[in-house]
Amino acid sequence: MAKESYKRDKPHVNIGTIGHVDHGKTTLTAAITLVLSKQGLAQERDFGSIDKAPEERERGITISTAHVEYQTDKRHYAHIDCPGHADYIKNMITGAAQMDGAILVVAATDGPMPQTREHILLARQVNVPSLVVFLNKVDIADPELIELVELELRELLSQYDFPGDDIPIIKGSALKAMEGDAEGEKAILELMDAVDAFIPDPVRDVDKPFLMPVEDVFSISGRGTVGTGRIERGRIKLNEEVEIVGLRPTRKSVVTGIEMFQKLLDEGQAGDNAGLLLRGVDKTELERGMVIAKPGTIKPHTKFKAEVYILKKEEGGRHTPFFNGYRPQFYFRTTDVTGSVTLPEGVEMVMPGDNLAIEVELLAPIAMDEGLRFAIREGGRTVGAGSVTKINE
């Protein structure tokens, strides 16, 4: 059977289910596929197939993630669901599964629990732009309790700078929907309407300002210096001005040639592996770890705050804790830079398996924005992962 071609007739959005263990994230994911499959908009996936999520490696970290796809009348969705709490933390911090929005699942019988809070905080820290809430198990909860849980949730969301008063909270039962109950199914359709309406269309990478990390550098005799890499975002056209940012003082240049697979192009765009010929740049002035970007859109920094996850020993991480002043390498995009770590007040040491907020000072400046992901390495071995939450300098 020939492969079906991917139709781009609807906006594509990446979402996922987040929330406390056993509140019904995977059951809800299965229920969405079941209900939408009845309209021909999804292939039904049972709980077991989602729960046995395959392992993936992202920035040297093994994460179990299930990928499910479905459509509504308005959009095409790629939906991720993780079996374990640690998988969520790793997923959100490494950006392995970038989410444009998330469905926060809360059991009405329990209300917000520690992981509910932690997932909301992480969603805020790693820039998940918006949340919709599914209040699950309402069929077995006391109606008065449901109202209290809703109030508590709105307060909790507001506490972490989400619009708690405006976020849609859909009440339902994922299990009832799985059993084919009409009320149960109606709640799932309501949830998908809320997701369609409340989670904004993502800005496509192509429409963002141009940026390409430099992976390799070579010179063409008589023509100049070429930087190669995969274009991360935006587009670049011939004779456009660019800035070279990171490691050394920022400098300007002009792109006089764009090459891809040995062919010359007029334009390169996000996702392309390209070589850019740069006017007036010496081979010694360009190196791996710099970025070539649209002027004025990104600056080099050395000091930042980050949310990090430190690998357990079983995951190939450190066997021992580390302390204030720890100096590993931070791997940004294409290169390692040494940096020193300041722990939050009151934290004496960090154990393998912990996730926490730290401050970092790098030895050399790197082009960065808030939300940039990195790996923490020691001698080429990954011992952690992180996301820049605030730039200090």
Curated annotation (Swiss-Prot):
GO cellular component: cytosol
InterPro entries linked: EF-Tu_GTP-bd (IPR041709), EF-Tu_GTPase (IPR050055), EFTu-like_2 (IPR004161), EFTU_2 (IPR033720), G_TR_CS (IPR031157), P-loop_NTPase (IPR027417), Small_GTP-bd (IPR005225), T_Tr_GTP-bd_dom (IPR000795)
Keywords from the named record: Cytoplasm, Elongation factor, GTP-binding, Hydrolase, Magnesium, Metal-binding, Nucleotide-binding, Protein biosynthesis
UniProt-annotated binding residues for Mg(2+): 26
Residue span(s) of domain tr-type G: 10-203
The organism's place on the tree of life at top rank: Bacteria
The protein, known as: Elongation factor Tu
Keyword Hydrolase in annotation: yes
Gene: tuf
Molecular function (Gene Ontology), one example: GTP binding
Binding site for GTP: 19-26, 81-85, 136-139
